[in-house]
């Protein structure tokens, strides 16, 4: 079995993996797992990264996995951020401003015990966003969030 590469920055991940991906926090590896959603490695984790920058994002929660968390009181992988990897950075580790035409930025959180959706700080459920930064401190920020309802 070949070891998966580890990346520090989103542009390293995008250059190596590219395309549509599904990302989730990997507690055991203290990083994000990046799963390919197209190409020959579709459905496989192809990299681990300390930060990820995504465009055209959808927030996905598998309700069956969430119910298992609630019943067993034990974590499992059931919530994901789907999007396209981006490389638009300023070379100093900061996102160029403006990368997109952003009207609103919110912090995004997910807690299976609070509700079945990713939410902003006001507990408004989110379906997706124009862009998302998943940073090395495991905080997530969405530009132009798309609220449910």
Model-inferred region functions:
Residues 18-26:
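Short beta-strand-centered aromatic/proline hotspots
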């Amino acid at each position: 079995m070949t070891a998966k590469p580890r990346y520090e920055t989103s542009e390293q991940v995008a250059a190596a993996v590219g395309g549509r991906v599904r990302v989730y926090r990997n507690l055991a590896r203290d990083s994000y797992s990046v799963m390919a959603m197209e190409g020959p490695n579709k459905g496989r984790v192809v990299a681990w990264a300390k930060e990820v920058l995504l465009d055209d994002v959808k927030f996905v929660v598998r309700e069956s996995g969430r119910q298992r968390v609630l019943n067993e009181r034990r974590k499992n992988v059931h919530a994901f951020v789907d999007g396209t990897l981006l490389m638009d950075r300023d070379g100093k580790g900061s996102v160029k401003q403006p990368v997109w035409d952003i009207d609103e930025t919110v912090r995004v959180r997910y807690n299976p015990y609070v509700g079945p959706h990713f939410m902003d700080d006001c507990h408004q459920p989110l379906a997706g966003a124009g862009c998302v930064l998943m940073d090395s401190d495991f905080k997530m920020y969405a530009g132009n969030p798309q609220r449910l309802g």
